Regions:
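Charge-rich, low-complexity N-terminal segments
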Residues: 1-145
């Protein structure tokens, strides 16, 4: 079965959910992703999302089609879709990293490394910078249970 990695960005809708609703959504996605053998990491910075999904290509495409139609965000932009060998983000079925809600030390590291405005880290556009942010977020998750 072809394994793939899909990365996209989007902007939260004005009537975005509360933190509790967001965490409940991540829990539900984790359950769904486990059944579909999909791994994922969702990064939130201000009102911007960056998400990576890895798994069977058909399953990842099905999930992405649902994501595109989800009214909780807009301006969904596909950054990368590629076949993969080993997965980079297979530690979780879904994990959320809110860059605004990081511990101070971690937040300062991210602020030194990435462009930010008014305390909000701007999500990068270049693919190598996107991978850098995703892998830094993964490392942060691995260091914090």
């Amino acid at each position: 079965m072809n394994q793939c990695r899909l990365i996209y960005s989007s902007i939260a809708s004005e009537k975005f959910m509360s933190q509790e609703e967001l965490h409940a959504l991540v829990q539900q996605c984790a359950q769904n992703n486990t059944r579909a053998k999909i791994a994922g990491l969702l990064v939130l910075s201000g009102d911007r999302f960056l998400q990576v999904l890895e798994g069977p290509a058909k399953a990842v495409n099905r999930v992405f089609n649902k994501i595109i139609l989800d009214k909780r965000h807009h301006d969904v932009s596909l950054i990368s879709f590629e076949s993969i060998g080993p997965a980079y983000f297979d530690n979780w079925s879904m994990r959320l990293v809110d860059l605004y809600d990081l511990p101070m030390e971690s937040r300062q590291i991210f602020m030194r490394k990435y462009i930010h405005e008014d305390g909000v880290i701007r999500l990068p556009e270049r693919l190598h910078e996107v991978y850098s942010l995703l892998l830094d977020s993964k490392a942060l998750c691995l260091s914090v249970p």
